[in-house]
Curated annotation (Swiss-Prot):
Residues 450-453 are annotated as: G4. SUPFAM superfamilies: Initiation factor IF2/eIF5b, domain 3 (SSF52156), P-loop containing nucleoside triphosphate hydrolases (SSF52540), Translation proteins (SSF50447). The gene is infB. Residues 396-399 are annotated as: G3. Gene3D superfamilies: P-loop containing nucleotide triphosphate hydrolases (3.40.50.300), Translation factors (2.40.30.10), Translation initiation factor IF- 2, domain 3 (3.40.50.10050). The lineage of its organism: Bacteria, Pseudomonadati, Pseudomonadota, Gammaproteobacteria, Pasteurellales. Residues 1-24, 50-246 are annotated as: Disordered. Residues 340-510 form the tr-type G domain. One of its GO terms (cellular component) is cytosol. It comes from Actinobacillus pleuropneumoniae serotype 3 (strain JL03). Residues 374-378 are annotated as: G2. One of the essential components for the initiation of protein synthesis. Protects formylmethionyl-tRNA from spontaneous hydrolysis and promotes its binding to the 30S ribosomal subunits. Also involved in the hydrolysis of GTP during the formation of the 70S ribosomal complex. Pfam families: EF-G_D2, GTP_EFTU, GTP_EFTU_D2, IF-2, IF2_N. This is Translation initiation factor IF-2.
Length: 841
């Protein structure tokens, strides 16, 4: 073979367009990630040979069967022909013999030559039958041949498919001899050139140029085989894309991989679409088919989202949003043995019925004197020991109507409710409310009938009135203990304590003493020097100094603990109230306080709760916007009184804000633009100036910087220590913002006795004043048969010939009505004035 032929057979360099998917016009080279595989060609070849041999054997068997069938048909045709010939021969023999003359031999030969023609003429039906049999044989042979060809084609196709499957299995099971490589098309081409040159050099060393040429031919044959394999995999046809030797043949996935969808308790349509990797419109269409009309930002519940995701072919994983919180709560040591604990007693009743005075006598401390006006402003938590060494914890709740939520919290945290009712006052509204709170909390009631030392005291009346509210005393066959006491003189106090302890024994109160503590926040406030302070009632376990406490939205390490007397303590067991310092913020009263192990996890739970509360708040605001869309159209007609509330404790802030919200009317609305616990700061004053608000301080004062802003901006700042005064003054301020109300008052009535005509004034009515006073400048009405026929004003009022300003009852006068001349005898002229009536809330 010449050098030119070798050169022609050498592998030609492919164009850059076929080897890569980009050009070098912009200086970029596409980088491909490939894996080289070593394919066992011997196994592929062996599989192909076996498949071809099998197809050949099947074709031969089919051909042999067809040949046998054809021979059998031919034999049957010959047998039929012989039978027909025998029949003809028998016919000949049975015919009469014709005498043959010796000298007539040529004539005898003629009939022998014409014999076949005579036979054909004699039996044309048999000839037609033979033709039909021959045609039938031909058709059978043609059909058998076509069937054999089809079977051969099918066998060849099966053999080709088996060969492809064997080749793919061999390729998959082949050993990988190279790791992933990151290389360009130029680098791969250069590597191949180097390999060919090195092979050529080795060939020249042993055997000359021929071995190098042989190696090039083998390389070319291998590449051609690879191309053919790629063509077989990708399919045949004119439009089939040719596989490139430099491009990895990746098969596209037949079906889109649908990821699992994690769904929380609530999710918006947009978030669900994002997790499912589909357009939000697809979800909206699916929900429309399910009968639900939603928007892209609408929040849907977990069950609906699960149905939609499963309908669209996704697997759903339901997630509880409180998983982190549950995990933190489960990692607590609460398996200790339970022991008997002290009862928690809440003292409830109507305002000024003597609750704090009763507790004051029990504690032997003057607390009521410290309360402004003798009214308890927030919950007080105390624990006392009886003479026999047993302990009782008391919660003193406010009795004023504004402190409903605080009474509800007190009842929730309590074991026994002591209902204080004044013997001289009886059952009052807050008494009934206290009964309802006690029943809602499931706490038994002990009734303390107070002020029995007064002369007008009537304990039997109290029992009768409570009987109407299903509080039945033991005297009437019920289970409620009634104890008559006097907080002022100390009468019956021991009997009350004994009744409380007896009730606690019936309840069999127990709690875990050792282990991680849990409790409830009774009250909280912000102390200027100490920071956030929370009064926590421990319900189980022991709260120690240094514990990590998770409290609603807040968390922190207990830096210090104090009892109700301000004394430092290091630990507090069940039923003991303590003040806790060290929280990250002021928790809401009523929040559950729990000791956890990890401060980092406690912070995560607190932040999660804050975010969840923020979402709920925003959703509620959005709902309120939609619901109040039409009412906001007339918002310009409603006057607003902006108020900033600062109080000493969280419970007072809640009570004041709730009471102010209840004062709002259709015309004047109270808007609390700011509220908080602690003293009034410069920030509060700046907010009041910007929002034109009234500042209300409840048991707090403004600091020096705040006072400077208040004086400069002329802000209305008011201090209160009793909630009655606060609400009354806010009502007065709201009353001043009401639109005035006008009322018409009749001041005089005159009866027309005669009518005179005057050229200048027209009709003049001579009248007698029958009621009140007729005034010249006031508006009038003309009545006929007690029906108003004209409303206007007087043009003239004369007594005799003198003009007068007014005419009193029982006197005669002449009245000229302006722009009205149809006055008749018997009409009545009614004089009235418009009076502005002061409105109040």
């Amino acid at each position: 073979m010449s050098d030119n032929e070798i050169k022609n057979e050498a592998p030609k360099k492919l164009s850059l367009q076929r080897r890569t998917k980009t050009t070098v016009a912009d200086g970029k080279v596409q980088v491909e990630v490939r894996k080289s595989r070593k394919i066992d060609t011997a196994a592929v070849k062996k599989a192909q040979e076996e498949a071809a041999l099998k197809a050949k054997q099947e074709a031969e068997a089919k051909a042999q069967a067809e040949k046998t069938a054809a021979e059998q048909a031919k034999a049957e045709a010959e047998a039929a022909k012989k039978a027909e010939g025998a029949k003809v021969e028998a016919t000949k023999k049975s015919a009469p013999a014709v005498p043959v003359m010796p000298n007539s031999k040529p004539k005898a030969a003629a009939p022998k030559a014409e014999q076949p023609k005579q036979e054909k003429a004699l039996d044309p039906e048999k000839e037609a039958k033979k033709k039909e049999e021959a045609e039938l044989r031909r058709k059978q042979e043609e059909l058998a041949r076509q069937k054999a060809e089809m079977e051969a084609k099918r066998a060849a196709e099966n053999a080709r498919r088996l060969a492809e499957i064997a080749r793919e299995e061999a390729a998959e099971n082949g050993e990988e001899f190279e790791d992933d490589r990151f290389t360009s098309s130029y680098a791969r081409e250069a590597d191949r050139d180097n390999d060919r040159r090195s092979e050529a050099n080795r060939g020249r060393g042993k055997g000359g140029v021929n071995k190098a040429k042989k190696g090039d031919r083998e390389d070319k044959n291998e590449r051609n085989a690879d191309r053919r394999n790629q063509k077989d995999v990708k399919g045949k046809g004119k439009n089939a894309k040719k596989g490139s030797a430099l491009q990895q043949a990746f098969t596209k996935p037949v079906q889109v991989n649908k990821a699992d969808v994690v769904i929380g308790e609530t999710i918006t349509v947009a978030e669900l679409a994002n997790k499912m990797a589909v357009k939000a419109t697809e979800i909206i269409k699916t929900m429309m088919k399910m009968g639900e009309m939603v928007t892209i930002n609408q929040v849907i519940d977990q069950e609906t989202a699960q149905l939609v995701a499963e309908e669209m072919g996704h697997k759903v994983i339901l997630r509880n949003e409180n998983e982190l919180e549950d995990a933190v709560m489960e990692d607590r040591d609460v398996d200790a043995e339970k022991v008997t604990r002290a009862p928690v007693v809440t003292i409830m009743g109507h305002v000024d019925h003597g609750k704090t005075s009763l507790l004051d006598y029990i504690r032997k401390a003057k607390v009521a004197a410290g309360e402004a006006g003798g009214i308890t402003q927030h919950i007080g938590a105390y624990h006392v020991e009886t003479e026999d060494g047993k302990m009782i914890t008391f919660l003193d709740t406010p009795g004023h109507a504004a402190f409903t939520s605080m009474r509800a919290r007190g009842a929730k945290a309590t074991d026994i409710v002591v209902l204080v009712v004044a013997a001289d006052d009886g059952v009052m509204p807050q008494t009934i409310e206290a009964i309802q709170h006690a029943r809602a909390a499931g706490a038994p009631i002990v009734v303390a009938v107070n002020k029995i030392d007064k002369p007008e005291a009537n304990p039997d009346r109290v029992e009768q009135e409570l009987l109407q509210h299903e509080v039945v005393s033991e005297k009437f066959g019920g289970d409620v203990q009634f104890v008559s006491v006097s907080a002022k003189k100390g009468l019956g106090i021991d009997d009350l304590l004994e009744a409380i302890l007896l009730q606690s024994e019936v309840l069999e109160l127990t709690a875990v003493k050792e282990g991680m503590a849990s409790g409830v926040v009774i009250e909280s406030y912000l102390d200027k020097g100490r920071g956030p302070v929370a009064t926590i009632l421990v319900q189980s376990g022991t709260l120690n100094k240094g514990d990590i406490v998770l409290c609603g939205f807040e968390y922190g390490r207990v830096r210090a603990m104090r009892d109700e007397n301000g004394k430092e303590v290091d630990s507090a067991g069940p039923s003991i109230p303590v003040e806790v310092l060290g929280l990250s913020g002021v928790p809401a009263a009523g929040d559950e306080a729990t000791v956890v192990r990890d401060e980092k996890k406690a912070r995560e739970v607190a932040l999660f709760r804050q975010g969840k509360f923020r979402e709920v708040k925003l959703a509620r605001q959005q709902k309120a916007k939609l619901e109040n869309m039409f009412s906001n159209m007339t918002a310009g007609d409603v006057a607003e009184l902006n108020v900033i509330v600062k109080a000493d404790v969280q419970g007072s802030v809640e009570a004041i804000c709730q009471s102010l919200a209840e004062l709002s009317t259709d015309e004047v609305k109270v808007k609390v633009v700011g509220s908080g616990v602690g003293g009034i700061t410069e920030t509060d004053a700046t907010l009041a100036a910007a929002s034109n608000a009234i500042m209300v301080g409840f048991n707090v004062r403004a600091d020096a910087s705040a006072r400077r802003v208040i004086e400069a901006e002329n802000i209305d700042l008011r201090y209160y220590s009793i909630i009655y005064e606060l609400l009354n003054e806010i009502k007065a301020a709201m009353s001043g913002m009401l639109q005035p109300e006008f009322k018409q008052e009749i001041i005089g009535l005159a009866e027309v006795r005669d009518v005179f005509r005057h050229p200048k004034f027209g009709a003049i009515a001579g009248c007698m004043v029958t009621e009140g006073v007729v005034k010249r400048n006031n508006p009038i009405r003309v009545l006929r048969d007690n029906v108003v026929i004209f409303e206007g004003e007087l043009e003239s009022l004369r007594r005799f010939k003198d003009d007068v300003s007014e005419v009193r009852n029982g006197m005669e006068c002449g009245i000229g009505v302006k722009n009205y001349n149809d006055v008749k005898v018997g009409d009545q002229i009614e004089v009235f004035e418009v009076v502005e009536v002061k409105r109040s809330i």
